[in-house]
């Protein structure tokens, strides 16, 4: 499907002017006539390029503070006119064919993201003429090329050179897809913003703007196809958000290893998000989306050694995340000790990568150093619907804890309690975590009764010969009965951290007092399903 179309006239009107001067220079040097509007036209003229203002071409001035620029038959007729079919009427009305449209849209997303953005500010950044030209050109892609991404500029010039001043239908069709994706995402952002304003805008309502729009529009970009999904009979792909600002598995760079699988990505996300909770050098080992070993240490090697000791059996074939650069010593320890699917860290030294290269199947990802955690939304698909909630970024500090028992925790118990509370947030409910000296010693995950999670954590610790006596225990939600406390006490736990809030809190606290256990209430729950 070659069907080449020569590019003789291009209309350029962009908000993001990155690369536009160089692109316009390349087009002009190849004999392409340039039409432009407003700030883009002024910029090109300042650079000495021969450019015709759209208002001069149409004979109709820009008006209403730039609200009306390109909404004119001589513009849209030139874009929508079908070559070989509409030529007579175009000639009759002095409409010149426009072969390429280069447009990106007003920065609506950036505007509404600014603190203190008013509805009036948002409205003035809703592009009208831009999307209209984009859709017109994309509709008529058989004859017209539409360019909405500056990243395409170089490839377009190369193809024009390779095809004697023309672009192929395949290229124009691909550009049209990008254009429709661009306008769909743009309109979705506007719809989401206006939808969230409904409570504050209707009638005499004094309600604040809603957190969730009445219609939720989502746009994700496909990053990769996968061999299969969670199971081999399921097809799958990985989609990511555009302009993600926080270091994540979605933004990470894979520096070695096989392509990531569906399960690799899910588990790596769980490991990375958990290790982000710690300021000290930390290591998190994950299996089936649950931490099976977590520790902080004097170095990441120390942290890895301690995390691995929690559950070496489960660590086999796991995902390992660090919050510091992967160094050669740690890489060697991992490769020598265990089979690992993925290692992710902010960065990796050259020496470390030489060591991991010996195991070509090991996937190594670098994600960059992270800063402040970015608020966002979490989604859970149910049959016929979507559950949406704020991302769980909640965490408590020592000053927010309430001691509810007769005995106060020791300094080490308190440190361990805060440590295992951070881990429990990332363990599937019902979640119980035993910790001692800033390392997990037993993790009970995903049980239907909390007492069995507590028992499993104790069994795990015993199996690995880890001393539970003097340890702290975290529970992601309250204890409905005292049995979980009794099980923990039998194992040797001396401090418990939990949300509180059960109708039997008094009974649970009394059990802790009976066993001489210090108990801390967080008043915050961390269910994870």
UniProtKB/Swiss-Prot annotation:
Keywords: Acetylation, Hydrolase, Multifunctional enzyme, Purine biosynthesis, Transferase
Recorded metabolic or biological pathway in which this protein acts: Purine metabolism; IMP biosynthesis via de novo pathway; 5-formamido-1-(5-phospho-D-ribosyl)imidazole-4-carboxamide from 5-amino-1-(5-phospho-D-ribosyl)imidazole-4-carboxamide (10-formyl THF route): step 1/1; Purine metabolism; IMP biosynthesis via de novo pathway; IMP from 5-formamido-1-(5-phospho-D-ribosyl)imidazole-4-carboxamide: step 1/1
GO process annotations (BP): 'de novo' IMP biosynthetic process
Catalysed conversion reaction: (6R)-10-formyltetrahydrofolate + 5-amino-1-(5-phospho-beta-D-ribosyl)imidazole-4-carboxamide = 5-formamido-1-(5-phospho-D-ribosyl)imidazole-4-carboxamide + (6S)-5,6,7,8-tetrahydrofolate; IMP + H2O = 5-formamido-1-(5-phospho-D-ribosyl)imidazole-4-carboxamide
An example Gene Ontology molecular-function term: phosphoribosylaminoimidazolecarboxamide formyltransferase activity
Family matches, as Gene3D superfamilies: 3.40.140.20, Methylglyoxal synthase-like domain
Protein name: Bifunctional purine biosynthesis protein PurH
